[in-house]
């Protein structure tokens, strides 16, 4: 019997949610995703010490540029060992500033191109705010493909699809966390609210012919992953990838394109904002996620400034 990881790869593109080059080399994902929190972890890995020194030297005291250069250097290193794409995140503090998001995204692509990496191997990650979705819509028109992250609500998924973004990252585990804390209940299998959210989005996209890729993210256990087997892509931590690799049990496909989905609805800005207002979980987790990424970005900047 093959491992659950190998079985999963038969019907889902497996992505590594890490900046750890050793883990990526060992687990052989197609793509990889990073974010400010993962870059902060990567900065603490001894193997990245020389790279940290180099980017700080190249940035000549510009801490913002040093952080961008570090993100791109980590991404470029990962691209040497995967066949697919790297997702690199825009500073979360810009999440409500469309012009600033556009400027930063273009700058990251320019840094990748300067490192010899074509833009078709990079996805720019943006938080799924209204402004982030609008920025993504413009970037897609410019040939810069995007990954809309911190996605917790159905309204966010609807707006992303209408904007023609390349990929969304709905967060399974954080939705589960919210409901578990809110209700005091334990959720398993198909009853998991995070699993239900991604399943609903996947079925809606397929039923309405959207090309936007659904990439489930933020998993707490392999049970959540098993329930979403068949999703376009799943981005998974090295720890859970290893558990799947070590498990020789059967893993059937659960999500399939033919399953019924809801009718298409195009949301205006006011409808989007109202839907978010009515979704306590989505609103709270989006705000919390932006705050956390912003704090880790600030920690990374401090690291760049301290060692400059």
Curated annotation (Swiss-Prot):
Reaction catalysis annotation: D-sedoheptulose 7-phosphate + D-glyceraldehyde 3-phosphate = D-erythrose 4-phosphate + beta-D-fructose 6-phosphate
A Gene Ontology cellular-component term: cytosol
Enzyme Commission number: 2.2.1.2
Transmembrane segments: none
Single GO molecular function: transaldolase activity
Gene3D superfamilies: Aldolase class I (3.20.20.70)
Domain of life of the source: Bacteria
Disulfide bonds: none
Recorded family membership: Belongs to the transaldolase family. Type 1 subfamily.
Biological function: Transaldolase is important for the balance of metabolites in the pentose-phosphate pathway.
Subunit description: Homodimer.
Name of the protein in its database record: Transaldolase
Source species: Pseudomonas putida (strain W619)
Gene, per the UniProt record: tal
């Amino acid at each position: 019997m093959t491992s659950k990881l190998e079985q999963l790869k038969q019907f889902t593109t497996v992505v590594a949610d890490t900046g750890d080059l050793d883990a990526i080399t060992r687990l052989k994902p197609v793509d990889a995703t990073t974010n400010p929190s993962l870059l902060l972890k990567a900065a603490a890995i001894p193997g990245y010490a020389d790279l940290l020194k180099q980017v700080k030297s190249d940035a000549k005291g510009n801490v913002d540029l040093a952080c961008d250069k570090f993100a791109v250097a980590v991404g470029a290193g990962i691209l040497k060992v995967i066949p697919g794409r790297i997702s690199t995140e825009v500073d979360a503090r810009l999440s409500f500033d469309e012009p600033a998001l556009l400027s930063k995204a273009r700058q990251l692509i320019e840094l990748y191109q300067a490192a010899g990496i074509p833009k078709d191997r990079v996805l720019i990650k943006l938080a799924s705010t209204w402004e982030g979705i609008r920025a993504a819509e413009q970037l897609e028109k410019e040939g810069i493909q995007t990954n809309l992250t911190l996605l917790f609500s159905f309204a966010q998924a609807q707006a992303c699809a209408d904007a023609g973004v390349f990929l969304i990252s709905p967060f399974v585990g954080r939705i589960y966390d919210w409901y578990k804390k809110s209700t005091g209940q334990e959720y398993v299998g198909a009853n998991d609210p995070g699993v239900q959210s991604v399943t609903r989005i996947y079925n809606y996209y397929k039923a309405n012919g959207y090309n936007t890729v659904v990439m489930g993210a933020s998993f707490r256990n392999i049970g959540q992953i098993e329930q979403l087997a068949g999703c376009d892509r799943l981005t998974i931590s090295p720890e859970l990838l290893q558990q799947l690799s070590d498990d020789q049990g059967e893993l059937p496909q659960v999500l399939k394109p033919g399953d019924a989905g809801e009718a298409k609805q195009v949301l205006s800005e006011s409808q989007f904002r109202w839907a978010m207002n009515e979704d306590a979980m989505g609103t709270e987790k989006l705000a919390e996620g932006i705050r956390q990424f912003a704090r880790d970005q600030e920690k990374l900047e401090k690291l760049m400034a301290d060692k400059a």
